[in-house]
Amino acid sequence: MDKILKKLDYYNLWNKAYLIILSLYVLINVLDTTMFEINWPEKMGYVLYAIVGGYAIAKMICFVYLKRYRAWELIFSFIIIGTFTIPAVFTTSYSYLFGIAFLIVGAKDVDFDDILKVYMIVTAAVLICAVVASQAGLIVNLQYEDPNKGIRNSMGTIYPTDFGAHIFYLAVAWVCYRNKALTWLEIGIISAVTIVVYVISAPVTSAACTFIMLFMCIWDKLADKTGSPMIVSKAEDIVCRIGQFAVGIFAAGYLLMQHLYDPLNIYWSEFDYKISLRLYYTYQILEKYSIRLFGQDIEEKGFGRDPDMTHDYLFLDDSYMAIALKYGIVILAVVIIMFAAGQHRAYRSNRLIIVLAGIVIALHCFMEHHLIEAAYNPFMLLIFAKIGAYTYKERKHKL
């Protein structure tokens, strides 16, 4: 038995198996955000959760036997599985939390750069197919008319902001994967793509956050430059130290803002209008539901796929309030700790771009609901993954 487990470890089979499972999981989830009509086999989701769960549990047993876990990793792995399982079991709509929990735990010691690579390849391939198919008339290109933004195209996805979110997360994943090897040409290409996507779909939050991310990349390059003022690198370090807790800071900020919101106050109304009535819609949902320890089924209207849905739209767009209301305040607390721990590990590994990306993602999730969605955010897998610290030459060699 001992020899078998050590051989699995020696040949890196655990990591290879994880990347195969991850690619399948991301593929299915990204396809579900497009207009491709796929009739999955009955109980396909449960089969997928069983595969991910079986892998994660077997790996945990093996790694405990080989003493590959630190105490905090093992304890927090059980906390994630336990807390995510409760709403997955007791609410009919959230069984996918099984898959998310086991994906996070199963990423133990898998190179995070390999995770990013798999995510980018699968997501980009699906998006390219969706865009081409929508323009060729093979699937629907949903169009939404906005009085301020004109016609917004979904480009084969279920909603324009979903298309924008995919591009945003791909851009962030790319700059983190490239790390210190990111070139000015790549920054220019990402900027151009972001502008084109904005013209086509007008995803304001995703476009703004992409440019903020690129600004941070430029800042990081200047901080590394020989002869750069000490204040530039010092400021980056201070921002990264604070930024490790970005998800918690933005979550607390949104919950406080929602608590103070008054729909009859003209100043709140003007501010809420600028953020697309997110506070008002959440306020309406809070009239019917309260925040619980482990969440509840919430009836929402606004999952995309329908250009006429705006007439009775009622959706939790913000990630933090969505998690608190749907999955429970306990899950939100676990998610906040999970992201803080992952960001801290990235900071300790000198992967400052990942820490800066975490800040931008936390800001993005202030407006969008993708914080713990496998189709969008691979950074939720950071906490237990292997985070390599690469110099410029080492990164170039790896690429």
What kind of feature is each model-predicted range?
Residues W268-Y327:
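Long extracytoplasmic/lumenal interhelical loops at the membrane interface
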Residues D2-D32, G45-L66, A71-P263, D312-R395:
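Hydrophobic transmembrane helix bundles of membrane-integrated enzymes that assemble
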Residues I38-G45:
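Internal amphipathic alpha-helical repeat/solenoid segments
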Residues H397-L399:
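Membrane-proximal cytoplasmic C-terminal regulatory module of class A 7TM GPCRs
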